[in-house]
Amino acid sequence: MPRVALYPGSFDPVTNGHLDVVRHAVALCDRLIVAVGVHPGKTPVFSADDRLAMARSVFEPVAVEAGCAFDCVTYDDLTVAAAHKVGATILVRGLRDGTDLDYEMQIAGMNETMAPDVHTVFVPASPGVRPITATLVRQIATMGGDVSPFVPQLVASRLRTKFAG
């Protein structure tokens, strides 16, 4: 039975931290599905279609190189429901620090109660990407700062275009 993993997130924007998680995740599964969340009430910088396209462009080559099947989808329901829809039994979550661990453990516990067949796997961030958050990247970009150390080149270019003033 193939190991199918779901890596959910808003990916607004895709960061080098997300890319780090994908590099680890493709070694843990036979098929990785990146799920771009669409949440009512949130106003993302990039549309769901843009985030999906950027995620696919950045992550798919990593999966292909690792010999891992890959797909990218959007979802607007519970993460465990999205996992069930695509046949995933593994949820991949990145951890930067203890604060992330505390938060993610709560979510993992709730998810396991709702879907005992779906297991959360935590991937610790590599040291070079631990300080990166999409929120900080957005703040830097909106103020005209250079985000290229924190995001893939494609994303840096899209952010420059988005916030060119």
Swiss-Prot record:
Keywords: ATP-binding, Coenzyme A biosynthesis, Cytoplasm, Magnesium, Nucleotide-binding, Nucleotidyltransferase, Transferase. Substrate binds at residues 10, 42, 79, 93. One of its GO terms (cellular component) is cytoplasm. Its cofactor is Mg(2+). ATP binds at residues 10-11, 18, 94-96, 104, 129-135. Gene3D superfamilies: HUPs. InterPro entries: Cyt_trans-like, PPAT, Rossmann-like_a/b/a_fold. Its main location: cytoplasm. It is found in: Cytoplasm. The keyword Cell cycle does not apply. Pathway: Cofactor biosynthesis; coenzyme A biosynthesis; CoA from (R)-pantothenate: step 4/5. It comes from the Bacteria. Its EC number is 2.7.7.3. It is an enzyme of class 2 (transferase). GO terms for biological process: coenzyme A biosynthetic process. The record marks 18 as: Transition state stabilizer. The keyword Nucleotidyltransferase applies. It catalyses: (R)-4'-phosphopantetheine + ATP + H(+) = 3'-dephospho-CoA + diphosphate. GO terms for molecular function: ATP binding; pantetheine-phosphate adenylyltransferase activity. Belongs to the bacterial CoaD family. Homohexamer. Reversibly transfers an adenylyl group from ATP to 4'-phosphopantetheine, yielding dephospho-CoA (dPCoA) and pyrophosphate. This is Phosphopantetheine adenylyltransferase. It comes from Nitrobacter winogradskyi (strain ATCC 25391 / DSM 10237 / CIP 104748 / NCIMB 11846 / Nb-255).
